[in-house]
Amino acid sequence: MPNTPQESMEDVSIAYMQGLCAYNGYTLSIERRDNDGVDITIKCKGYPSTTSGCLKYSPTLDIQLKSSFARFKQKRNGDITFILESKNYNNLVIGDRMTPIILVVLHMDRDRKKWVKHSKSALKVTKCA
């Protein structure tokens, strides 16, 4: 039986982040259990780059991933808001975390056939994070 649309969206969001990490030379670890609002962790060996502005050696970043096509609202000025459950928000705003955490939201198209396109010359993930 195929994955549900939500499970597939989660897989696409992980693949999207994996592609960005691979391109930039970072490692991505998928958390086995989401007990603390963390879905993936990104690590960099050494200093990220001279232009990144990061002055820390071997930085680590925890990420809570979300993917949706329905929980977005676009404001008149073009800004986009995302409806986030309070428990997820509360996990993100804890001030004394050892490792910083951010929310990454992949905006999916309603048409599942448009999520990922592949051919001999390209692999394309549509919409944006």
How should these model regions be labeled?
Residues 1-36, 42-129:
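Mixed-charge (Asp/Glu-Lys/Arg
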